[in-house]
Amino acid sequence: MADKEATVYIVDVGRSMGECRNGRSVTDLEWAMQYVWDRITGTVATGRKTATMGVIGLRTDETSNELEDDVHFSHIAVLSNIKQFLMPDIRKLEDELKPSKTDKGDAISAIILAIQMIITHCKKLKYRRKIALVTNGQGRMSDEDLGEIVKKVKEDNIELVVMGIDFDDPEYGYKEEDKDPRKAENETLLRTLVEDCDGVYGTFEQAVAELDIPRVKSVRSVASFKGYLQLGNPEDYDSALRIPVERYYRTYPAKPPTASSFVLRSEPEAGQEEAESSEAAAATQKGSQSGDIGLTTVRTMRTYQVEDKSAPGGKIDIERDDLAKGYEYGRTAVHISETDENITILDTFAGLELMGFIQTDRYQRYMHMSNTNIIIAQRANDKAALALSSFIHALFELECYAVARLVVKENKPPVIVLLAPSIEPDYECLLEVQLPFAEDVRTYRFPPLDKVITVSGKVVTQHRNLPNDDLLDVMGKYVNSMELVDADEDGDPVETFPIDDSYSPVLHRIDAAIRARAIHPDQPIPPPSERLTKFSHPREDLIERSQKYLEKLIEIADVKKVPPKAKGRKRTRETEKPLSGLDVDALLHHEKRAKISPNNAIPEFKQTLAQAENIEAIKDATKQMMVIVEDQIKHSLGNANYDRVIEALGTMRDELVSYEEPASYNDFLGQLKDKLLQEKLGGDRQELWWLVRRNKLGLVTQRESDQSRVTDTEAKEVSLTKMKE
């Protein structure tokens, strides 16, 4: 479970925050809110109820706080008490955080008020407490009772963060020229306060510059297995090894947030609102939390029906409890009773049993089949830690891996895992990955890359398909010129692309887009951060350095550009000339094909279309294929010819779409279905039409071809029309 958090943001909205300074095109408040919105939306995106926030407005026109009777707390407004933030709260906060008409208000008093809010909300419970002050340092600040503030912050373990606009920061290397004396005095006051509280003090130049750095989410690990690592059967042998261990993820893929479906909420009919279920009410509440009260979540309702000719409509409804579990075998649902199903379940007990050992040099890394996990000793068990440490060191010294059988939970299927020792200065563990069973391994033999073996068994090392020495030499130089590891002044290697600077573009781009839309729903989504796109293209210096080797490689390898594939009607386009410049058809004296042979229908159909000079020739070829396909169906013994028919239909569909004649295919498919419905092609052929639907060989729609007049709805109706009972 994640730690509870309570954060209070103090945002300076004084009149001076509405001005643009130091050549910026945005106001100080707009510039500062980039940081505030980034932190708030990042917390909202977690969806955790334990991640709470509050917002205080500093130097506001009005005063609204529990200490407003004290003059020191004037022009300070609590815009939101500490709570879980949702989309409506962000919308409300966006409207309230506007520059005021006054510069009165004390930032130190706002910090005192934030401390009081945290104490009231958190009480003595375990929370991660934090106060973040965002200001430009203008106006008056009181330096009274700073010692008491520091004492209270440390007592309640509150982290104090002060982010200042144009604040001097020697560590970051920023200094504002011609600084106002009062602002300089306020900066010194805030810096002293933060340093005494062991907090964080920084300038917005650094904070805004680091906003495009994706934040990697830290996740608290949860044990996926708790049991015993054992060698031998402890029930039969006293010498058996048995160590209490725990298993955690070492690596796990992060996934972007999934989409949710919403619909416009309709007004309930009379009497319907009272009968609304608790589930529907919860869904409605969730829709309102999304920030738009006009939306509600999509709710799924399933009904089960069976055919009954005596019932109205030919079907009757049944309850889910009356259904029996079945498994698909081909296109047949096979029922297995609960008694028979228990036979197929392997009775297993949770545990990690050692099966054997293997030398490290005999293991191939391509055998990995899963993410990496770690095995550590049971927590707070010194005896188990000592025993596991001895086992880890034994594997390390003998250069061995252990092979074990893992059952995570009782009656779960077992898996075979590899255990590798990992020893660091202050940390030891076993790295665990899943291995394949013998039946999972598929062995394929490929021809060698450095030689050619003829039919007679002769080995040839000089061949047109093998690279010569010159080509290998140039390729080696080209690869070396693209080396990503540079050298420093001492000649030591320096990694140009450190793995820690590599982020998932999909994950962080979606996250940034969601947060941008949450803050500014009517503005376009900003472009992706350069940190996400810099690995999508090579560096300029690498391109320049390798260009001469690339040109030499193209010359020696005799690389030629393939002509681009022409678009448009195949029948009106010129025949592509081969690179050799020779007319192959003229050399072979190919004559135009007049009739398509049923024995070689598909290749001859393609050839006929390629030689067609007008639409009539295309239609004639299509009619010939129609006759051949119908003849194959009519004379098919059962489903013997169905595969040939499906292949022919697929070829006809693709070719006629590419020749922009989808109407010919649609007409043929409509005629074919009518004949199948009337059983004119050798009796009942329902299975064939099912294959047509499964292979998505239905009508060509307008979405697939501009020449088609069939809509998606019409194509679906034709496809789903039931065959004759």
From Swiss-Prot:
Keywords: ATP-binding, Chromosome, DNA damage, DNA recombination, DNA repair, DNA-binding, Helicase, Hydrolase, Nucleotide-binding, Nucleus, Telomere. It comes from the Eukaryota. It catalyses: ATP + H2O = ADP + phosphate + H(+). Heterodimer of Ku70 and Ku80. It is found in: Nucleus; Chromosome, Telomere. GO terms for biological process: DNA recombination; double-strand break repair via nonhomologous end joining; telomere maintenance. One of its GO terms (cellular component) is chromosome, telomeric region. It comes from Aspergillus sojae. Single-stranded DNA-dependent ATP-dependent helicase. Involved in non-homologous end joining (NHEJ) DNA double strand break repair. DNA-binding is sequence-independent but has a high affinity to nicks in double-stranded DNA and to the ends of duplex DNA. Binds to naturally occurring chromosomal ends, and therefore provides chromosomal end protection. Required also for telomere recombination to repair telomeric ends in the absence of telomerase. ku70, of the ku70/ku80 heterodimer, binds to the stem loop of tlc1, the RNA component of telomerase. Involved in telomere maintenance. The keyword DNA damage applies. This is ATP-dependent DNA helicase II subunit 2. Residues 259-294, 704-725 are annotated as: Disordered. Its EC number is 3.6.4.12. Residues 285-294 have a biased composition (Polar residues). InterPro entries: Ku70/Ku80_beta-barrel_dom, Ku80, Ku_C_sf, Ku_N, Ku_PK_bind, SPOC-like_C_dom_sf, VWF_A, vWFA_dom_sf. Residues 229-481 form the Ku domain. Belongs to the ku80 family. GO terms for molecular function: ATP binding; ATP hydrolysis activity; damaged DNA binding; double-stranded DNA binding; helicase activity; telomeric DNA binding. It is an enzyme of class 3 (hydrolase).
